[in-house]
């Protein structure tokens, strides 16, 4: 996910110029993010399968426990589809510049078909308390893991695209039980981890309007409903946008936020006397707009069209996400050096089994033209900039946007999926950032 590296382009947007303006830079980076076969719907001489997806229980304003249980028929159908994949010819280059190499995807798909075990992932998810509740008319899924330690600080974590709650599963025990993982009891957190609307086990919006600001309002209501009166929030990718919108909303009890994808730019881009960090940031933005924004433009302008292809082909869905694990993680050339095949397939399988290719892509369309940073922010903000992040904002730019920048660090490893790639390091960043915001 996340937004563009400036304002998002509309239809017919002009190509990025060699000397990018702030508008052009900002404009390419947001993503700098069947089940039971249904009854056929008869048409004139045609029959179409009903939309796939898990049958989710209706949500109510109450907090309802939820257990994940994918029907076996969905897993059988997945393996059948994987075995029937129609492959294109191989790429004409020896790298990833044309997309996922054929041999790499075939290897991942064969592992998915013959060796991968969704039930293991399902059991891991169910190890934590899962719930659903209705927020602004939509059923929202969330994990809520409370710490055993007194005075633990509630933290609201928000994922992005193509991520999910699965990104944070290794992080949860590090936050809730720090004494078991080299930390101190006073560093404990209660973890609240929702699935964005249209993602995972949350409902899919049936009407437009679910942009970052609306999601932020729903998250504020969730924290109030859970009874928290002093809490913090964290996000990367689209989660950074939602968390920033939450900070601008300043709901009761929100003490501060942490971001690992601060998409901030100065009001006026300087043309001379750029620091090395500023030169690097501008080069990153231009490179993304030129070489890495194809998915972003598609999902910003035609999420429904993309959805038809991905909803019908698990191999296509895998390629769409696997490519991002290669390009956006701190790896040695192959994504498997940053994340295991099982870890990547846990996330890919969640998208496939919940049939959320189109609904998750719509977050780009919903936020076209939005200001990702939302302007000046007065709430306390902490930032961790990981070395293989899509865009590494200079501290000077962050200071111009965040008047209360309470924490800034640039760890030595990790990428866009930092919590997934480096959970222990990510936990350390959160402990350090929020230590000063804990209730006395």
Swiss-Prot record:
Signal peptide: 1-49
Highest rank taxon of the organism: Bacteria
Root EC class: hydrolase
GO MF entry, a single one: epoxide hydrolase activity
One GO BP annotation of this record: catabolic process
Keyword Signal found: yes
PROSITE patterns per record: TAT (PS51318)
Alphabetized UniProt keyword annotations: Aromatic hydrocarbons catabolism, Hydrolase, Signal
InterPro entries noted in UniProt: AB_hydrolase_fold, Epox_hydrolase-like, Epoxide_hydro_N, Epoxide_hydrolase, TAT_signal
Chain segments carrying region Disordered: 1-21
Enzyme Commission designation: 3.3.2.10
Post-translational modification: Predicted to be exported by the Tat system. The position of the signal peptide cleavage has not been experimentally proven.
Catalysed transformations (reactions): an epoxide + H2O = an ethanediol
Homology family: Belongs to the peptidase S33 family.
Protein name: Putative epoxide hydrolase
Annotated source species: Stigmatella aurantiaca (strain DW4/3-1)
Lineage: Bacteria, Pseudomonadati, Myxococcota, Myxococcia, Myxococcales
């Amino acid at each position: 996910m996340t937004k563009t590296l400036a304002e998002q382009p509309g239809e017919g947007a002009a190509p990025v110029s060699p000397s990018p303006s702030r508008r052009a830079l900002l404009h390419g980076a947001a993503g700098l993010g069947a089940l039971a076969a249904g009854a056929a719907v008869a048409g004139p001489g045609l029959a179409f399968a009903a939309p796939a997806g898990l049958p989710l229980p209706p949500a109510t304003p109450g907090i309802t426990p939820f257990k994940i249980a994918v029907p076996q028929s969905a897993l059988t159908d997945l393996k059948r589809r994987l075995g029937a994949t129609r492959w294109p010819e191989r790429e004409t280059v020896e790298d990833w510049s044309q997309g996922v190499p054929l041999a790499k995807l075939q290897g991942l798909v064969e592992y998915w078909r013959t060796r991968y075990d969704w039930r293991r992932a399902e059991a891991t998810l169910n190890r934590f308390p899962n719930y659903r509740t209705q927020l602004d008319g939509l059923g929202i899924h969330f994990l809520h893991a409370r710490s055993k330690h007194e005075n633990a600080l509630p933290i609201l974590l928000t994922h992005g695209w193509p991520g999910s709650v699965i990104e944070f599963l290794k992080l949860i025990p590090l936050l809730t039980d720090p004494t078991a993982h080299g930390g101190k009891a006073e560093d404990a957190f209660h973890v609240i981890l929702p699935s964005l609307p249209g993602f995972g086990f949350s409902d899919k919006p049936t009407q437009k309007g679910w942009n970052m600001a609306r999601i932020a309002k729903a998250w504020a209501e969730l924290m109030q409903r859970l009874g928290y009166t002093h809490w913090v929030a964290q996000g990367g990718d689209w989660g950074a946008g939602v968390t920033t919108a939450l900070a601008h909303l300043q709901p009761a009890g929100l003490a501060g936020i942490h971001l690992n994808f601060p998409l901030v730019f100065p009001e006026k881009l300087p043309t001379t006397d750029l620091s090395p960090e500023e030169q690097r940031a501008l080069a990153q933005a231009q490179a993304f707009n030129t070489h890495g924004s194809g998915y972003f433009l598609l999902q910003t302008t035609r999420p429904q069209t993309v959805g038809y292809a991905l909803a019908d082909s698990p191999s296509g869905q895998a390629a769409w996400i696997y490519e991002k694990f290669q390009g956006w993680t701190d790896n040695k050339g192959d994504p498997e050096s940053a994340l295991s095949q099982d870890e990547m397939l846990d996330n890919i399988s969640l998208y496939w089994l919940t049939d959320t290719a189109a609904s998750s892509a719509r977050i780009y369309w919903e936020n076209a033209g939005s200001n990702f940073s939302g302007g000046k922010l007065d709430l306390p903000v902490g930032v961790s900039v990981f070395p293989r992040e899509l865009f590494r904002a200079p501290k000077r730019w962050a200071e111009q946007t965040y008047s209360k920048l309470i924490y800034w660090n640039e760890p030595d490893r990790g990428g866009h999926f930092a919590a997934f790639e480096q959970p222990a390091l990510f936990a350390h960043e959160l402990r350090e950032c929020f230590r000063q915001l804990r209730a006395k």
